[in-house]
């Protein structure tokens, strides 16, 4: 079944038409999932489906409940007559002592951050410390040039990027430790030009960090490694605490949003492999952009498939066009709609869901929750082994 995104943008979150479209699509998605993968269904999803089968509230009921006539999204206008961004999409201007210190340290160590390369709107908040006072930066390793060209990403691309710096794992680890952080996110460009896709370099960086500061929690936001199981295993067993890989968008929009070498099923398999190879206690995580032209029903179906893959944490954020050369924004999803996805995600059994217009996959707001989850898991594991 196909739902016109323009139609969904015009109608309200709580309308009968949207409820009808949701119900038809979600029943098809749920029934097919139950038939195809019953052994992989999580307890939370099983309970949710049982309620549906027994005439309980549908997923569309869950999403539309209490929103009344609140809109699902705000239009962006046309190319000739663009509308202004909604007030909730206004980002703070970068500044402050911590921001200046981190920027200087990065230049001194010749390090790259995805914050700058991808023009992240949260750069000012994360580097200055925001409400928590804890400054964070997501370090990008394996250089600043990607072998792929996704339509949403501002990182520069090349078929033959410069070779990785062999000293980078040590330089990155020493720089991060000098900042006194307790939680750090490492990410990288895609390196299809390397025999191991850069997985060995990634693993060395994690291992070096753990050697210098064993108690530091390390999240690795990795590429798909072309679905290579050996590469996934190498990183998953490197000593990290969170294995993250982003599916980026719903299955129907993969070829529109991502490079042709990436696809939904390959990314889903990477997350499944990570869960299989990772030691007990390692969390898996993924992220989805909204506002690319997807429908709410497609988002729900994506959430189900991701949860069935055993993923622990999922984040949702608004897609923002980095430059005019990149894919245009289809709509601005409202904070209320993001909140509904957050509640539905928890209902489905995700251990943590970060969902908001300004949320990004490596956004600092979720680190405190994830850190607490990891520490609690380890305490339980330690007490049970006594």
Curated annotation (Swiss-Prot):
Localisation: Mitochondrion
Enzyme class: transferase
One Pfam family this sequence matches: Radical_SAM
Gene3D superfamilies, A to Z: Aldolase class I
Cofactor needs: [4Fe-4S] cluster
Matching PROSITE patterns: RADICAL_SAM
Coiled-coil features, chain-numbered ranges: none
Pathway stated in the Swiss-Prot or TrEMBL entry: Protein modification; protein lipoylation via endogenous pathway; protein N(6)-(lipoyl)lysine from octanoyl-[acyl-carrier-protein]: step 2/2
Molecular function via GO: 4 iron, 4 sulfur cluster binding; lipoate synthase activity; metal ion binding
GO cellular component: mitochondrion
Binding, [4Fe-4S] cluster 2: 146, 150, 153
Domain annotation Radical SAM core: ranges: 131-351
Further remarks about this protein from its record: This protein may be expected to contain an N-terminal transit peptide but none has been predicted.
Protein's name in the database: Lipoyl synthase, mitochondrial
């Amino acid at each position: 079944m196909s739902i016109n995104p323009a139609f969904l943008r015009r109608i309200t979150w709580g309308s009968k038409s949207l409820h009808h479209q949701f119900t038809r699509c979600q029943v098809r998605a749920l029934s097919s999932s139950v038939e195809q993968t019953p052994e992989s269904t999580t307890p939370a999803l099983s309970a949710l489906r049982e309620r549906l089968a027994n005439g309980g509230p549908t997923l569309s009921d869950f999403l539309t409940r209490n929103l009344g006539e609140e809109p699902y999204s705000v239009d962006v206008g046309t190319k000739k007559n663009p509308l202004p961004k909604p007030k909730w999409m206004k980002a703070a201007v970068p500044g402050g002592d911590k921001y200046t210190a981190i920027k200087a340290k990065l230049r001194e160590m010749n390090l790259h951050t995805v914050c700058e390369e991808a023009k992240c709107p949260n750069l000012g908040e994360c580097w200055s410390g925001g409400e928590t006072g804890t400054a964070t930066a997501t370090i990008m390793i394996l250089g600043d040039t990607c072998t792929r060209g996704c339509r949403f990403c501002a990182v520069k691309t090349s078929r033959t990027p410069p070779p990785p710096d062999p000293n980078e794992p040590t330089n990155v680890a020493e720089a991060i430790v000098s900042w006194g952080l307790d939680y750090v996110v490492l990410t990288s460009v895609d390196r299809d030009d390397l025999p191991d896709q850069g997985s060995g370099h990634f693993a060395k960086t994690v291992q070096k960090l753990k050697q210098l500061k064993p108690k530091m929690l390390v999240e690795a936001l990795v590429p798909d490694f072309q679905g290579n199981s050996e590469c996934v295993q190498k990183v998953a067993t490197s000593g990290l605490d969170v294995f993250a890989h982003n599916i980026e968008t719903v299955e129907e929009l993969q070829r529109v949003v991502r490079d042709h070498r990436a696809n939904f099923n390959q990314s889903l398999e990477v997350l499944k492999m990570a869960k299989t190879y990772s030691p007990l206690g390692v969390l898996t995580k993924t992220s989805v952009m909204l506002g690319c032209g997807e429908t709410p029903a497609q988002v729900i179906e994506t959430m189900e498939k991701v949860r069935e893959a055993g993923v622990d944490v999922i984040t949702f954020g608004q897609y923002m066009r980095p430059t005019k050369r990149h894919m245009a924004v289809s709509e601005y999803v409202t904070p209320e709609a993001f909140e509904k996805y957050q509640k539905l995600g928890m209902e489905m059994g995700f251990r943590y869901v970060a969902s908001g217009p300004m949320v990004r996959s490596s956004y600092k707001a979720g680190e405190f929750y994830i850190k607490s989850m990891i520490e609690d898991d380890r305490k339980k594991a330690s007490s049970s082994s006594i």
